């Protein structure tokens, strides 16, 4: 995590240094850049957490209805040295789970579909994986990375715009360059996200003593997502699968939530490049190695 933070800070530092160089040593501009970046990341973090929970209709997980899950999360949290996160349950339409928030104020959401298909040990592996994300501050790190990507893109736009003749051609060039730079930084952030998934898998394996339960859980989740995607395609072919609000993946989850979940359905080469998760088969192979 220290290396990841250092690299993200390097991107941010380069952006601020470039703004300082091109716009002059103006204390006001520098102050606005720093304050604006902090506010941007903070807003993204707060709004992102709220939207993720709201989009799946997450509700507090009743301890009387799910006593074992509460006990296991409390035990695993204690072993990982973190405060027990808030537990929520949701009807996602697919078997999955995700974590939001930071260490000391985290939330783990588990779909009812996941609870229905997993054995106790398999569910323990999933819970340990999500707790690892909270313990390692992965969600906060990814939000920070996305915020820095936006800042770097904005700085690149203004550099192109103000270093030219400030005409219409420069305006469109600035947009293209800014989006391209932001995309390139985002690719790096996504690579970090895929790496952190492997780390969370390894932490979960250590927490429960074996990687086999989580490997089986990932297989079942992958199968469940594929079945849901197939049903969605069938509904679409019959004309009943028109998208309502926002852009959604074939599994029916908002893309923002899908990025947080333990498993992602991305399969094509391009999807793998811009995916937040590594291929499920590789994760299973590592867990069983």
Swiss-Prot record:
Co-factor requirement: Zn(2+)
Membrane-crossing residue ranges in chain numbering: 3-23, 28-48, 144-164, 172-192
InterPro entries reported for this sequence: HtpX_protease, Pept_M48_protease_HtpX, Peptidase_M48
EC number(s) recorded for this UniProt protein: 3.4.24.-
Catalytic center residues: 130
Main location: membrane
Coiled-coil intervals, chain numbering: none
Database matches in Gene3D superfamilies: Metalloproteases ('zincins'), catalytic domain (3.30.2010.10)
Compositional bias (Basic residues): 235-246
Cofactor note: Binds 1 zinc ion per subunit.
Residues that coordinate or bind Zn(2+): 129, 133, 197
Keyword Disulfide bond listed: no
Region (Disordered), start-end ranges: 222-250
Gene Ontology molecular function: metalloendopeptidase activity; zinc ion binding
First-tier enzyme category under EC: hydrolase
Keyword terms of this UniProt record: Cell membrane, Hydrolase, Membrane, Metal-binding, Metalloprotease, Protease, Transmembrane, Transmembrane helix, Zinc
Superkingdom, taxonomy of origin: Archaea
Topological type in the membrane: Multi-pass membrane protein
Similarity field: Belongs to the peptidase M48B family.
Name the UniProt record assigns to this protein: Protease HtpX homolog
């Amino acid at each position: 995590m220290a290396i990841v933070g250092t690299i993200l800070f390097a991107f941010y530092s380069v952006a601020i240094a470039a703004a300082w160089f091109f716009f002059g040593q103006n204390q006001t501009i520098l102050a606005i850049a720093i304050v604006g970046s902090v506010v941007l990341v903070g807003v993204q973090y707060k709004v992102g957490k709220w939207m993720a929970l709201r989009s799946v209709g997450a509700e507090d997980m009743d301890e009387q209805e799910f006593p074992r899950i509460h006990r296991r999360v409390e035990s695993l949290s204690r072993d990982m040295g973190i405060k027990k996160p808030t537990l929520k349950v949701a009807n996602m339409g697919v078997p999955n789970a995700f974590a939001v928030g930071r260490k000391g104020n985290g939330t783990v959401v588990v779909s009812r579909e996941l609870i229905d298909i997993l054995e106790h040990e398999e569910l323990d592996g999933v819970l340990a994986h999500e707790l690892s994300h909270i313990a390692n501050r992965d969600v906060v790190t990814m939000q920070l990375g996305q915020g820095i990507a936006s800042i770097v893109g904005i700085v690149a736009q203004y550099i192109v715009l103000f270093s030219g003749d400030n005409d219409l051609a420069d305006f469109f060039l600035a947009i293209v360059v800014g989006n391209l730079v932001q995309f390139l930084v985002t690719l790096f952030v996504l690579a970090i996200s895929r790496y952190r998934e492997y780390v969370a898998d390894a932490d979960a394996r250590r927490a429960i003593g074996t990687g086999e339960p989580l490997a089986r859980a990932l297989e079942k989740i992958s199968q469940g997502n594929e079945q849901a995607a197939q049903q969605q395609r069938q509904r679409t072919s019959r004309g009943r699968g028109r998208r309502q609000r926002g852009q959604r993946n074939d599994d029916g989850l908002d893309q923002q939530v899908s990025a947080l979940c333990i498993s992602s359905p991305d399969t094509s080469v391009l999807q793998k490049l811009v995916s937040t998760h590594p291929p499920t088969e590789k994760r299973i192979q590592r867990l069983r190695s």
